């Protein structure tokens, strides 16, 4: 599977599946989830929350509505209770779950944000390392392209350096 890193707004990406950085309730609030919710139009938040709550590390799939994708895979790296903080295990499990869901749907391309960072509180560089390690180790059936995405210039530079070490 080709593994690249890109910079930009995940809601503007084109792929078979876009991964949402979700909490266990699957409610689409701010950050990556907010960007996807606003760009998708339609009842994506309602569809997502109807599939939750899910266990930490699990993923659920919705339609992508107006996004340039077929599906949004909502990967729960953050609990919506307690301290609401992501962990190494939750980031790894959510990344694997997202890739497996996209693969099971027959997707060939997927865009994955650095799960567990931002409002979920995990340090970006370490989170990027965990996500990149899981993407690099994944043995796909249908997926042929995975892009890990960062929004800001500084996060992209960090992601690029991490991916170069991991690949």
Annotate each predicted stretch with a short phrase.
Residues 1-88, 92-104:
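Glycine-/small-residue-enriched capping loops at alpha/beta junctions
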Residues 79-167:
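Phosphate/ribose-phosphate-bearing ligand recognition and processing surfaces
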């Amino acid at each position: 599977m080709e593994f690249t890193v890109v910079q930009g707004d995940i809601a503007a990406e084109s792929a078979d599946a876009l991964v949402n950085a979700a909490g266990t309730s699957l409610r689409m609030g701010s950050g990556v989830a907010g960007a996807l919710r606003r760009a998708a139009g339609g009842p994506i938040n309602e569809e997502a929350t109807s599939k939750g709550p899910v266990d930490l590390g699990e993923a659920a799939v919705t339609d992508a509505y107006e996004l340039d994708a077929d599906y949004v895979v909502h990967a729960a790296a953050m609990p919506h209770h307690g301290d609401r903080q992501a962990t190494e295990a939750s980031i790894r499990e959510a990344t694997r779950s997202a890739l497996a869901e996209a693969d099971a749907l027959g997707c060939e391309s997927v865009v994955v944000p650095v799960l567990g960072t931002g409002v979920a509180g995990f340090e970006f560089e370490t989170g990027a390392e965990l996500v990149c390690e899981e993407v690099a180790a994944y043995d796909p059936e249908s997926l042929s392209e995975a892009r890990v995405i960062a929004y800001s210039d500084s996060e992209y530079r960090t992601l690029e350096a991490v991916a170069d070490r991991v690949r």
